[in-house]
Amino acid sequence: MGRAHEAAETMRRGGGIGYDFSRIRPRGDTIKSLDSQSSGPVSFMGIYDAVCQTIASSGHRRGAQMGCMRVDHPDIREFIRAKRNSDRLTGFNVSVGVTDKFMDALKTESGEFDLVFEDKVYETINAHELWDEIMESTWDWAEPGVLFIDRINEMNNLYYCCLLYTSPSPRDS
């Protein structure tokens, strides 16, 4: 809960926060040390959303959060659909981190693309179908955004700091 406390303090002071949820185990993945299963990244987003809804930052503006997930994460479809219910994750903007590998898969007829976590392939999907789902969701719900993450990191002057994503608000960038 230390990160949630840090997030609350940042938002209380008027700041915005970006999170990369790609490093959280996919839903249903085994957690050996606990002999349990992961609830997945989207469930963790709910915790941070509750913090954001609770904190009114400097004045009446609520905190701003951006949740990102790599396009190759096994829970990417759940992430894309997470905000279709207007009552869910209202303290978040969400964006998909699109990789060069995904864009290359879109250029092929088969569109084969692997969803992976910690070098384990969970599923091979059709990149064309996933791209269509991203675009339809963006058209219908105005989310997710698309971040060409490899290009961003390639052009990043602070590449050695491993910066992955940016702030949800242009003035906080």
Map each language-model feature to its residues.
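Long, structured ligand/cofactor-binding scaffold of large enzymes
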Residues: 1-53
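Conserved, charged catalytic cores of large soluble enzymes
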Residues: 24, 33-47, 57-160
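Conserved small/polar residues in nucleotide/adenosyl-binding loops
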Residues: 165-170
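Extended, polar beta-sheet/loop recognition surfaces of beta-rich domains
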Residues: 173
